[in-house]
Amino acid sequence: MAVATSLVVWGMFVLMMLLFGAGCQARRVPLPGRELAFVRTSGSHFVLNASNSPFLFNGFNAYWMMHLASDPTQRYKVSHVFGEASAAGLTVCRTWAFSDGGDRALQISPGTYDETVFQGLDFVVSEASKYGIRLILSFVNNYKDFGGRQQYAQWATNAGVQINTEDDFYTHPVLKDYYKNHIRKVVTRFNTITRMAYKDDPTIMAWELINEPRCQLDYSGRTLNGWVEEMAAFVKSLDKKHLVEIGMEGFYGDTMPERKQFVNPGYQVGTDFITNNLIKDIDFATIHAYPDIWLSGKSDDEQMGFMERWMSSHLEDAKRILKKPLVIAEFGKSSKDPGFSLNEREVYMGNVYRDIYRFARRGGGTMSGSLVWQLMGEGMDGYHDGYEIILSQTPSIAGIISRQSHAMTTLMSHFFTNNNHA
């Protein structure tokens, strides 16, 4: 019976892909005056605040947007990517609201900001709104790219504070104060273009505490748990209108030893998917998925099998234990993988999207959407990391993304109709 049901669902997905194929093109130009509603949660689902209607999405990552937009002569590339994304039906974008020290720093030193770079972020928020795309904005990086925890630790060291390790970021009062100040600065920012504070702008779907948090000094997850609890509450004290998520990859901890042993890809990073996401001020859970990195050397079939288990186990736990929505916040296929071909990326993305749709349908919308890593425009070679997708140069990938967008939109309409007739 389970096999038959799966075949029926897959058949429906394929049928929708055919029906909504090349002829389904979303808008390519901004829609002046269009207003977005705030997204909130209702149990394990996203809903739109104004209508209480279900919200599912297909989305993308574009970490580079503020960095590029800080140069006004390059802003057209941001607009172009938003236009291409909108044309493919993508409605959520995850990007950085940080650049700590270094090139084009937003935060030059603790509490000191470059207004030109901040205006770049203003532009990103404004352009997203024009194209009907919501944003997930991340506050800091776990890694040294664009500063991250390492830069915070260095700032404190330079100020004469005794810092032992980057993991002090989660516990040292000075580092926590630096970070809280940055949160306050971003959340309360008054946009110079929209003339609206970020905390009042429904273009922003959610705040992300940190990109891929890890704490090597405490594998139990308790250190990170205390930090998340404190920082999520702090964000909510400034802004009760927006959702908050952690930015986790999804690694299991001691709460579920069987998941830790059989689902984790052999990693311990000091996080616990269950306890970290059970914190009351965390509104939804995220996972990232990179089997081409985590299971390097394994076959494509083995990597795809892991991907299916990774998604299905987290969906089950989000629905049954967390009772919160789940987002696949990063996934992709790198051109740097041995033997890479565009066809491999097409097959992989098609399979992942198929499973996301299937799990979203099976879970009643708990698996609410995904964000492919990552979209870029032409002439951005300096930002390439192997995962970049330039839609204008890869029409086959653009078609796969577009069909997934329409599949998720159709499923959202199906849930809306059923709710209204329940």
Question: Residue locations for each model-derived region?
Answer:
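Cleavable N-terminal signal peptides of Sec/SRP-targeted secreted and luminal proteins
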Residues: T5-A26
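C-terminal helix/juxtamembrane-tail motif
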Residues: S405-A422
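Low-complexity, Pro/Thr/Ser/Gly/Ala-rich linker/spacer regions in secreted
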Residues: R27-L31, N419-A422
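Short, low-complexity, Lys/Arg-enriched N-terminal segments of secretory-pathway carbohydrate enzymes
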Residues: M1-V3
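Active-site mouth of glycoside hydrolases
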Residues: R28-P325, F331-I356, A360-Q404, M408
